[in-house]
Amino acid sequence: MVEVEHWNTLRLRIYIGENDKWEGRPLYKVIVEKLREMGIAGATVYRGIYGFGKKSRVHSSDVIRLSTDLPIIVEVVDRGHNIEKVVNVIKPMIKDGMITVEPTIVLWVGTQEEIKKFEEDAIAERQ
């Protein structure tokens, strides 16, 4: 049986368009670089194949209907205080999109040594 502990971890999702830019560069790349600079645990970028946003315009990767602005999701899981810092830095970059944050439970991350350090940090954080 897996023992689940609350480590105050959050999942941050940033929903943007593939064509969104920041200072002329793809926004999703700028965000990931900024996350890395900030020492965030990790980030993954997902490219949507079909979807629509608040304007109800459908974006599709179908060959027949090739969209040039597919949905992009940047996902991050880290401790709450790190996610809060990220939101404060990233939010001004988002001109059209959505940011969500939700609690998440991390069951496994990395090597045994990394897990031990993660657990020790979580315990110290509570004190």
From Swiss-Prot:
The family line of this record is:
Belongs to the UPF0166 family.
Q: Name one Pfam family in it.
A: DUF190
Q: What InterPro entries is this protein classified in? A: N-reg_PII-like_a/b (IPR011322), N-reg_PII/ATP_PRibTrfase_C (IPR015867), UPF0166 (IPR003793)
> Which cysteines does the record link by disulfide bonds?
none
- What protein name does the entry list? UPF0166 protein PH1503
